[in-house]
């Protein structure tokens, strides 16, 4: 599942994203954030974090540096 989601993001970056001007308000970009989140947290939580990030990426949000959160150690 993880490989499929990352493949979809890479496909978007290769085929769809070049058709539009750069518009992501965040650093790293939303697609890079998605790849990092899925690699770090797995398919379910990574996709959830990515969805939240995409929903925040709009003209009324200031954007800026917003890295993937670190993995919290289990107690």
From Swiss-Prot:
Q: Which Pfam families match?
A: YidD (PF01809)
> What's the name of the protein?
Putative membrane protein insertion efficiency factor
Q: How does it sit in the membrane?
A: Peripheral membrane protein
Q: Which family does it belong to?
A: Belongs to the UPF0161 family.
* Described function: Could be involved in insertion of integral membrane proteins into the membrane.
Specify whether Translocase is a keyword of the entry.
no
PANTHER family assigned: MEMBRANE PROTEIN INSERTION EFFICIENCY FACTOR-RELATED (PTHR33383:SF1)
User: InterPro entries per the record?
Assistant: Membr_insert_effic_factor_YidD
List where the protein spans the membrane: none
Its subcellular locations are: Cell inner membrane
- The organism's superkingdom is given as Bacteria
Gene Ontology, cellular component aspect: plasma membrane
Keywords of the record, alphabetical order, are: Cell inner membrane, Cell membrane, Membrane
Q: Which organism is it from?
A: Gloeothece citriformis (strain PCC 7424)
